[in-house]
Regions:
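Terminal helix/beta-alpha structural elements that buttress the NAD(P)+-binding lobe
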Residues: 1-206
Length: 206
């Protein structure tokens, strides 16, 4: 049994599945906080690393809803999905800075790092100001360069959950579910997660 205060809960809209609802709390609120941390507005160009992962796949959609031009860093297998959601897909690897410059027209306004491993440095190299860079994973780089780490700031905000659930319910936001595992297969789920090649969220069910 789990006991939760009533004001920490929201109703599940009819068009939101239990799997989507389960994935929404952490990934959805983290993506929401990261997108709003970099102060996106219509016409801005934002780069998002890990753009097809659990958090990134939601962040790219929220950025598009705000009217931003979104460049998503992802493996080639996820480029079609990103393009279907209006995102300019860019491959990882050597030459990524030049590919981003080509896709952006030479200038970016903001960078959301949902992957880690040097992307804060890349964001600075591309000219994003520290106060418009947010990382949800590379806290050492954030401390070194003074960039934001606001990925969890919306977690306890039920109004954010209500807003996200409404976007799903009205078809404006998709929560990609990579795979659903039963709790007995939790080891397999974590091994899948560790490979970092999933599109969207991995969900555990009883």
């Amino acid at each position: 049994m789990v006991v939760v205060e009533a004001d920490h809960l929201i109703g599940r809209p009819p068009h939101v599945s239990w799997e989507q609802a389960g994935a929404l709390f952490v990934a959805g609120t983290t993506a929401y906080a990261a997108v709003h941390a970099v102060s996106l507005k219509a016409g801005d160009t934002v780069v998002i690393s890990g753009a097809a992962d659990g958090v990134g796949s939601i962040a790219v959609q929220l950025a598009k809803i705000l009217g931003a031009k979104v460049i998503g860093l992802a493996s080639a297998a996820n480029h079609t999905w990103l393009a279907e959601h209006g995102v300019i897909a860019v491959a990882y690897g050597e030459g990524v800075a030049d590919r981003i410059r080509a896709a952006s027209g030479g200038k970016i306004d903001a960078f959301i790092d949902a992957f880690g491993g040097g992307y804060v440095d890349l964001a600075l190299e591309l000219g994003a100001a520290p106060d418009r860079i947010d990382t949800i994973i590379d806290f050492a780089a954030a401390a070194k360069h003074g960039v934001k780490t606001e990925g969890n700031s919306a977690a306890a905000n039920t109004q954010v959950l209500v807003e996200l659930a409404s976007l799903i319910d009205t078809g404006r936001l998709e929560i990609p579910i990579a795979k659903v595992y039963h709790l007995a297969d939790v080891r397999d789920a974590y091994q899948d997660l560790a490979r970092r090649h999933t599109r969207g969220k991995i969900v555990l069910v009883p």
